[in-house]
Regions:
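Extended, histidine- and acidic-residue-enriched regions that form the cofactor-binding/catalytic faces
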Residues: 1-83, 87-103, 109-231
Length: 231
């Protein structure tokens, strides 16, 4: 069940039996010449929808823009300031809590979001603590899980891609998006097939160091190995 494809009476009926909602959260940023800009949002969205269908959990609209300032030299990347993202997550959560949701499960697809999501949770809990009527309200709980940390995921990734899995524009995450959106598969020559490693400082430094094969930073993946059937 997806919130944005539901009516308000359907959501009201859902709340009568469950107070939980899953929110996919990610980023819109470059993932190299064959990886979709929405990869970090699409992966938790695809996985979250499947999990929601199987478990009967409501899945909210995807929070698809996050912390991507270091990718801003690559066209199409969109980023938020940490303060903006925290404020948006706070309003998002309070809106859901106002309707009666008590368990908000954020399924994350972008490592760069983790610190800001954690800070947002602190803001949310501070708000609850400072609300003098808080003791009369049902407990509100927020949870964060990165999709690649779900049970068995990394073992499967290493099994499918024993060389070059990396941590950005990985063959596993690109394969998930190709599985979900086969019409968007990009066929691009990858030379070398495994991207070089290296530190970056900021957006311009990133583009200077990796002007063509643009998806990489430390321990970047070999997205030349991805296949939609492996998603």
């Amino acid at each position: 069940m997806q919130l944005h494809l539901s009516t308000w009476p359907e959501v009201e009926a859902y709340l009568a039996k469950s107070k939980a909602v899953l929110i996919p959260i990610g980023s819109t940023e470059q993932h190299g010449p064959n990886g979709l800009l929405g990869t970090d949002a699409l992966c938790p969205e695809i996985i979250g929808k499947r999990a929601g269908d199987e478990a009967g959990i409501l899945v909210g609209p995807t929070f698809n823009v996050g912390q991507a300032q270091h990718h801003m030299s690559f066209p199409g990347t969109i980023t938020l300031r940490p303060s903006t993202m925290i404020a948006a997550m706070l309003d998002w959560t309070q809106s859901l809590a106002r309707h009666g949701f008590e368990r908000i499960y954020w399924l994350n697809g972008h490592g760069g979001n983790i610190a800001t999501i954690t800070s947002a949770f602190s803001e949310i809990y501070h708000g609850v603590s400072f609300d003098r009527s808080g003791a009369n309200h049902p407990p509100l709980r927020c949870s964060l899980r990165n999709w690649w940390e779900l049970p068995g995921v990394m073992d499967l990734c290493r099994q499918l891609f024993p060389v070059g899995e990396g941590s950005h524009a990985t063959p596993s995450e690109v394969s998930v998006t190709w599985f979900g959106y086969p019409q968007a598969v990009k066929s691009v020559a990858m030379t070398p097939r495994i991207a070089p490693n290296g530190p970056i400082l900021d957006a311009d430094d990133y583009r200077r160091r990796f002007p063509e094969r643009v998806r990489r930073w430390s321990f970047v993946g070999a997205s030349g190995y991805c296949r939609n059937r492996l998603g």
